[in-house]
């Protein structure tokens, strides 16, 4: 497994959610996972479908959540930010039991590939 150090520098403010400001990775093989979407009635249901897909992609390369060094999240509605944060608050301690949450960039955009999708999450992992 790659040597990964996820941390928050003292010179930066505390993260606003389940993420860290910095992921330092000693040169490693990288795994780029395309943005994942999932149908569902609301943001929680869609997140509950998206993250297992990411996990399957990680497992296909012999990796797991501990290999993730970056998430990029796209939301269609700013009012879904609290629901997305609640999902992470509930699920990330199980996925990242050491509390080293990967950096995450969250963008609110006009729409995704199909109107039914509310969230898309892309991941980068170091192997």
Predicted segments with their positions:
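N-terminal presequence-like segments and the immediate start of the first folded domain
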Residues: 1-70, 75-127
């Amino acid at each position: 497994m790659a040597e990964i150090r996820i941390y928050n520098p003292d010179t930066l403010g505390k993260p606003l959610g389940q993420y860290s400001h910095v992921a330092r990775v000693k040169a490693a093989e990288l795994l780029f996972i395309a943005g994942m979407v999932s149908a569902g009635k609301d943001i929680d249901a869609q997140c509950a479908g998206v993250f297992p897909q990411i996990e399957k992609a990680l497992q296909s390369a012999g990796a797991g959540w501990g290999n993730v060094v970056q998430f990029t999240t796209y939301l269609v509605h700013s009012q879904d930010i609290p629901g997305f944060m609640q999902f992470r608050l509930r699920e990330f301690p199980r996925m990242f039991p050491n509390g080293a949450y990967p950096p995450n960039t969250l963008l609110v955009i006009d729409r995704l590939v199909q109107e039914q999708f509310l969230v898309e999450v892309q991941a980068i992992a170091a192997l």
